[in-house]
């Protein structure tokens, strides 16, 4: 991400690495808290399914939901993907699309294949159960891999099996990666209309949320990242001008970002009918977009995202995202008679260690392989042209 940003003249993308790391940690917290049946009931019911202790109630139905807003963190990943994949295209005249496709697919599918095999191994070694005592989220995880489920998880584009639930987002990552030239063809012309087009993208997400049409909901989120890349310098200039001399400006932006990102849960807590609140989930899109902008241009948040810890989290974020959930579930089944806190205490450190190893031994190697594949395609193309 940082290299892509440098290539496009956007040197502050290092802070977005840290933001991505923070979002990955939020996803881990999200799945850890879903081990508690009461919070899993909140997540699936979207309402006060039962009386919660005050702090748990605040975690569920207030802006504090941000600390375990796993779904909204995935929206942030989608915006970042649109931004990061577009910047190198804009920076290089005559961008080599023939090299891009194999490079991108190796980069995505290599770690996914390894993660699926690891997840299948955890299911084999630690059998799963559908006992109601585990709560809704755990019970909804299938107990075994079938051949059909394995094919779904290894190919992604037709949907995933739910054995490793974070894989659902990779379906949309792959589709967006394949459709990136189409996004650019649609969004690069008529740049003066970008404000209207951003509003139209949010409107499409609203329609997708209202009609439960996943394509209409998810694919426009990537487009907002593409528009952000197209207007990067303009956004930076406007952010500097608008916040100059206004100490309250960035705090206000961050408050609005958090309120929008958690809007569905805040509204539920205020008594809004849960089905209506779920249809307002699209409000998280402008919220996570504001977080991306703030991480790039707000000095305080940028400094936080550039700390060593969040930079490390950003480096292992993809690996952590892929491997953590089967490990947490295995820890819960191994400690079934005890509180979910014990599963969290055991599972989270193991997941972090496995993620670090996975990043070094799997993800980084496929990243290097993807670069070699891209260079090989370019070299063959040059040879063919010279011949």
Task: Specify the residue positions occupied by each region the protein language model found.
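Membrane-interface helix-loop-helix regions
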Residues: 45-69, 108-174, 178, 283-295
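Alpha-helical transmembrane segments of multi-pass integral membrane proteins
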Residues: 63, 253-365
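Functionally critical transmembrane alpha-helices in membrane proteins and complexes, commonly lining
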Residues: 14-90, 112, 317
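Short, Lys/Arg-rich, polar N-terminal cytosolic tail immediately upstream
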Residues: 1-15
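Solvent-exposed interhelical
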Residues: 174-203, 230-246
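Transmembrane alpha-helical segments and their boundary/interface "anchor" motifs
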Residues: 19-20, 69-81, 85-128, 137, ...
